[in-house]
Protein backbone atom coordinates (compact mmCIF):
# COMPACT_ATOMS: atom_id res chain seq x y z
CA UNK A 1 0.00 0.00 0.00
CA UNK A 2 2.82 2.37 0.95
CA UNK A 3 4.64 1.52 -2.28
CA UNK A 4 1.51 2.29 -4.32
CA UNK A 5 1.02 5.62 -2.55
CA UNK A 6 4.68 6.53 -3.09
CA UNK A 7 4.44 5.53 -6.75
CA UNK A 8 1.30 7.62 -7.28
CA UNK A 9 2.97 10.68 -5.71
CA UNK A 10 6.01 10.38 -7.96
CA UNK A 11 3.76 9.76 -10.96
CA UNK A 12 1.91 12.97 -10.17
CA UNK A 13 5.19 14.86 -9.82
CA UNK A 14 6.36 13.47 -13.17
CA UNK A 15 3.13 14.54 -14.90
CA UNK A 16 3.27 18.08 -13.49
CA UNK A 17 6.99 18.39 -14.22
CA UNK A 18 6.50 17.20 -17.80
CA UNK A 19 3.70 19.72 -18.33
CA UNK A 20 5.80 22.54 -16.91
CA UNK A 21 8.92 21.58 -18.87
CA UNK A 22 6.95 21.28 -22.11
CA UNK A 23 5.59 24.80 -21.71
CA UNK A 24 8.66 26.47 -20.25
CA UNK A 25 11.95 25.10 -21.57
CA UNK A 26 12.11 26.83 -24.94
CA UNK A 27 14.96 27.87 -27.20
CA UNK A 28 16.50 31.29 -26.87
CA UNK A 29 15.31 32.02 -30.41
CA UNK A 30 11.79 32.32 -28.99
CA UNK A 31 12.81 35.63 -27.42
CA UNK A 32 11.99 38.83 -29.24
CA UNK A 33 13.70 42.20 -29.13
CA UNK A 34 11.80 45.10 -27.61
CA UNK A 35 11.29 47.86 -30.16
CA UNK A 36 10.30 51.39 -29.22
CA UNK A 37 11.08 54.84 -30.57
CA UNK A 38 11.54 55.92 -26.96
CA UNK A 39 14.26 53.36 -26.27
CA UNK A 40 17.78 54.16 -27.41
CA UNK A 41 20.40 51.42 -27.89
CA UNK A 42 22.96 51.04 -25.10
CA UNK A 43 26.40 49.49 -25.29
CA UNK A 44 26.84 45.95 -23.99
CA UNK A 45 29.50 45.54 -21.33
CA UNK A 46 32.29 43.00 -21.57
CA UNK A 47 31.74 39.90 -19.43
CA UNK A 48 34.44 38.02 -17.57
CA UNK A 49 35.12 34.27 -17.58
CA UNK A 50 33.03 33.70 -14.44
CA UNK A 51 29.92 35.35 -15.85
CA UNK A 52 30.30 33.80 -19.30
CA UNK A 53 30.94 30.21 -18.27
CA UNK A 54 31.08 29.36 -14.54
CA UNK A 55 27.93 31.20 -13.49
CA UNK A 56 25.83 29.38 -16.08
CA UNK A 57 27.00 25.98 -14.80
CA UNK A 58 26.19 26.98 -11.22
CA UNK A 59 22.77 28.26 -12.31
CA UNK A 60 21.89 24.95 -13.95
CA UNK A 61 23.08 22.93 -10.94
CA UNK A 62 21.06 25.10 -8.53
CA UNK A 63 17.94 25.04 -10.71
CA UNK A 64 17.98 21.28 -11.24
CA UNK A 65 18.65 20.69 -7.54
CA UNK A 66 15.81 22.99 -6.49
CA UNK A 67 13.34 21.36 -8.90
CA UNK A 68 14.20 17.89 -7.60
CA UNK A 69 14.18 18.82 -3.90
CA UNK A 70 11.00 20.90 -4.10
CA UNK A 71 9.16 18.68 -6.58
CA UNK A 72 6.49 17.75 -3.97
CA UNK A 73 5.94 21.48 -3.37
CA UNK A 74 5.58 22.09 -7.11
CA UNK A 75 2.98 19.34 -7.25
CA UNK A 76 1.11 20.60 -4.18
CA UNK A 77 0.97 24.21 -5.37
CA UNK A 78 -0.04 23.14 -8.89
CA UNK A 79 -2.93 21.09 -7.50
CA UNK A 80 -4.08 23.95 -5.25
CA UNK A 81 -3.94 26.46 -8.10
CA UNK A 82 -5.93 24.09 -10.32
CA UNK A 83 -8.51 23.50 -7.56
CA UNK A 84 -8.89 27.14 -6.46
CA UNK A 85 -8.30 29.08 -9.69
CA UNK A 86 -8.75 26.56 -12.48
CA UNK A 87 -6.67 26.53 -15.64
CA UNK A 88 -4.13 27.60 -16.65
CA UNK A 89 -1.93 26.76 -13.68
CA UNK A 90 0.91 28.95 -14.91
CA UNK A 91 0.92 32.68 -15.55
CA UNK A 92 3.28 34.05 -18.19
CA UNK A 93 4.37 37.64 -18.59
CA UNK A 94 6.78 39.43 -20.91
CA UNK A 95 9.80 40.85 -19.06
CA UNK A 96 12.90 42.68 -20.35
CA UNK A 97 16.00 40.51 -20.38
CA UNK A 98 19.56 40.87 -21.61
CA UNK A 99 20.58 43.56 -24.07
CA UNK A 100 20.64 42.11 -27.57
CA UNK A 101 23.03 42.63 -30.47
CA UNK A 102 21.16 45.80 -31.48
CA UNK A 103 21.65 47.39 -28.06
CA UNK A 104 18.02 46.89 -27.04
CA UNK A 105 16.51 44.59 -24.45
CA UNK A 106 15.33 41.13 -25.46
CA UNK A 107 11.93 40.20 -24.07
CA UNK A 108 11.37 36.77 -22.54
CA UNK A 109 8.43 34.92 -21.01
CA UNK A 110 8.71 34.78 -17.22
CA UNK A 111 6.73 32.00 -15.57
CA UNK A 112 4.90 32.01 -12.26
CA UNK A 113 2.12 30.08 -10.61
CA UNK A 114 -1.17 31.85 -11.22
CA UNK A 115 -2.48 34.02 -8.36
CA UNK A 116 -5.48 35.79 -9.91
CA UNK A 117 -8.82 34.83 -11.42
CA UNK A 118 -9.74 35.74 -14.99
CA UNK A 119 -12.97 37.53 -14.04
CA UNK A 120 -14.21 40.06 -16.60
CA UNK A 121 -16.75 42.86 -16.64
CA UNK A 122 -19.87 42.98 -18.81
CA UNK A 123 -17.81 44.34 -21.71
CA UNK A 124 -15.39 41.43 -21.60
CA UNK A 125 -12.53 43.39 -20.04
CA UNK A 126 -10.52 41.92 -17.18
CA UNK A 127 -11.38 43.36 -13.77
CA UNK A 128 -8.67 45.32 -11.88
CA UNK A 129 -5.82 43.24 -10.41
CA UNK A 130 -6.83 44.02 -6.83
CA UNK A 131 -10.28 42.54 -7.50
CA UNK A 132 -8.99 39.39 -9.20
CA UNK A 133 -6.23 38.70 -6.67
CA UNK A 134 -7.54 36.04 -4.27
CA UNK A 135 -6.57 35.38 -0.65
CA UNK A 136 -4.86 32.22 -1.83
CA UNK A 137 -3.02 34.25 -4.46
CA UNK A 138 -1.86 36.76 -1.85
CA UNK A 139 -0.54 33.90 0.26
CA UNK A 140 1.38 32.49 -2.71
CA UNK A 141 2.93 35.91 -3.34
CA UNK A 142 3.76 36.57 0.32
CA UNK A 143 5.53 33.21 0.58
CA UNK A 144 7.10 33.61 -2.91
CA UNK A 145 5.76 30.17 -3.86
CA UNK A 146 4.34 31.72 -7.01
CA UNK A 147 7.91 32.22 -8.21
CA UNK A 148 8.90 28.54 -8.12
CA UNK A 149 8.44 28.06 -11.91
CA UNK A 150 11.16 30.66 -12.50
CA UNK A 151 13.61 27.80 -11.87
CA UNK A 152 12.72 26.68 -15.39
CA UNK A 153 13.52 30.17 -16.69
CA UNK A 154 16.96 29.61 -15.19
CA UNK A 155 17.22 26.27 -16.98
CA UNK A 156 16.37 27.73 -20.39
CA UNK A 157 18.94 30.50 -19.90
CA UNK A 158 16.64 33.52 -19.77
CA UNK A 159 17.27 34.09 -16.05
CA UNK A 160 19.96 33.48 -13.44
CA UNK A 161 19.76 32.59 -9.74
CA UNK A 162 21.30 35.93 -8.75
CA UNK A 163 20.76 39.09 -10.76
CA UNK A 164 18.62 42.22 -11.04
CA UNK A 165 14.91 41.42 -10.84
CA UNK A 166 13.22 41.96 -14.22
CA UNK A 167 10.81 44.89 -14.28
CA UNK A 168 7.71 45.16 -16.46
CA UNK A 169 8.29 45.91 -20.14
CA UNK A 170 6.12 49.03 -19.91
CA UNK A 171 8.41 50.44 -17.19
CA UNK A 172 11.39 50.61 -19.54
CA UNK A 173 10.32 53.96 -20.98
CA UNK A 174 10.79 55.46 -17.51
CA UNK A 175 14.37 54.18 -17.13
CA UNK A 176 17.37 56.31 -17.95
CA UNK A 177 20.44 54.81 -19.63
CA UNK A 178 22.22 54.26 -16.32
CA UNK A 179 19.25 52.32 -14.93
CA UNK A 180 18.99 50.28 -18.13
CA UNK A 181 22.55 49.08 -17.58
CA UNK A 182 20.95 46.49 -15.27
CA UNK A 183 19.94 44.72 -18.48
CA UNK A 184 23.58 44.06 -19.37
CA UNK A 185 23.37 41.33 -16.70
CA UNK A 186 20.99 38.39 -16.86
CA UNK A 187 17.84 38.99 -14.75
CA UNK A 188 17.73 36.98 -11.54
CA UNK A 189 15.41 35.00 -9.31
CA UNK A 190 16.82 37.01 -6.42
CA UNK A 191 18.86 40.19 -6.16
CA UNK A 192 19.72 43.18 -4.01
CA UNK A 193 16.15 44.50 -4.07
CA UNK A 194 14.84 41.22 -2.60
CA UNK A 195 17.27 41.14 0.31
CA UNK A 196 16.97 44.86 1.04
CA UNK A 197 13.25 45.34 1.43
CA UNK A 198 11.62 43.90 -1.69
CA UNK A 199 8.35 45.81 -2.35
CA UNK A 200 8.93 48.08 0.65
CA UNK A 201 11.68 50.02 -1.11
CA UNK A 202 11.17 52.78 -3.68
CA UNK A 203 11.44 52.56 -7.47
CA UNK A 204 14.74 54.47 -7.41
CA UNK A 205 16.22 52.19 -4.73
CA UNK A 206 15.30 49.12 -6.79
CA UNK A 207 16.95 50.41 -9.95
CA UNK A 208 19.99 52.28 -8.61
Residue ranges and their predicted role:
Residues 1-12:
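Membrane-penetrating hydrophobic segments
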Residues 14-16, 20-21, 184-208:
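C-terminal terminal-structure detector
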Residues 47-52, 93, 117-135, 139, ...:
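Cytosolic-biased juxtamembrane loops and peripheral soluble domains of multi-pass membrane proteins
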Residues 52, 56, 71, 108, ...:
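Generic recognition of short, well-ordered alpha-helical interface segments
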Residues 78-82, 115-118, 138-141, 153, ...:
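Generic alpha-helical structural context detector
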Residues 112, 127-186:
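A short, structured surface patch at a secondary-structure boundary
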Amino acid sequence: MAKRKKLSVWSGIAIVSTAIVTNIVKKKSDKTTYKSVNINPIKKRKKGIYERYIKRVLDVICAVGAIIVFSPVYLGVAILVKFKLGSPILFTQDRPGLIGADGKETVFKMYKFRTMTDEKDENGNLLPDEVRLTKFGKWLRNTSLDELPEAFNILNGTMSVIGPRPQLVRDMVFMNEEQRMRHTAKPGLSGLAQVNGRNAISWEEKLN
